[in-house]
């Protein structure tokens, strides 16, 4: 009888232990050539295109006029005088631009007329544009190696932190498993000891005492493991945040030097083929962004409308949607097919710091995965600058 009772208690303990176990995210020549009115016709494979009207005279249809205005604004803000002259005085460069922008002949002709006028204005406004461009190039060639070295060091340290977090987390996980095992063993021995007490006249207390000791050891192991994990995470957060701040400060050095004259830095692009097609693809992005906006049902009805003149020479008014900037809408378009050289530095540097907001957010995370993402993001920014440094260096050696 006692044997059967002992067997039932043992089965009960094993069943309870099993129950606990089971519950457990990227032309320096030619101001004069522009003055000579270089031929503006460009064959884009669209011979049936009809004239749009004269943009400067305000006789163009409203939608095409708005596109020309957006394109002129883009060239004013994002393209250097040197590169604009190159585009307008080299027919091959212009044809490459038009092809990349996917412009029909009528729009290409009107855009070129508007750009001829813009080039004259830019030359008259800034006679020292060549000297400024050279100044920016010299600064970048001198300072970038230092910035690169410091950024690479920060990236290595971030990855080391991520590896450290993984190791500590793995260690504390093992400790927690050991703690759990000890706790289970403690529970079994304690239950067995208590269950056998009525049948062994106190002899089962021999099992009860080690069970309680194992329980205390399990509790201490769990507390120590959790404390180690929390301490490591807190320390890692502080270190990662410091590294990200230092890295962003390095990126800011580039932006602060360029200041309001960021467009002149575009002259660092040494590859005419890539330059002209890159600008063309950005203009294509402007057209697509506008087309997408117009294709949204009731989009125009959901925004207030304002009336503006098409041009300074014309009193004609057109109704225009008070909409988000097309430049802002197209900023997220990546020129991935221009890789591996990211010549369009202005798109990658002007907003380099501001687009890095999530680097701060990543630095607040204690996980190894997030730290690795932060390191990867910094490395991508560094690669953009490094590609441009190589272009400048090769151009200087010619």
UniProtKB/Swiss-Prot annotation:
Keywords: Cholesterol metabolism, Disease variant, Glycoprotein, HDL, Lipid metabolism, Lipid transport, Phosphoprotein, Secreted, Signal, Steroid metabolism, Sterol metabolism, Transport. The keyword Nucleus does not apply. GO terms for molecular function: chloride channel activity; lipid binding. One of its GO terms (biological process) is cholesterol metabolic process. Glycans are attached at residue 261. Phosphorylated by FAM20C in the extracellular medium. Plasma. Found on APOA-I-containing high density lipoprotein (HDL3). Expressed in pancreas, lung, prostate, liver, placenta and spleen. It is found in: Secreted. Residues 35-55, 297-317 are annotated as: Disordered. The modification Phosphoserine is found at residues 311, 314. It comes from the Eukaryota. Belongs to the apolipoprotein L family. May play a role in lipid exchange and transport throughout the body. May participate in reverse cholesterol transport from peripheral cells to the liver. This is Apolipoprotein L1. It comes from Homo sapiens (Human).
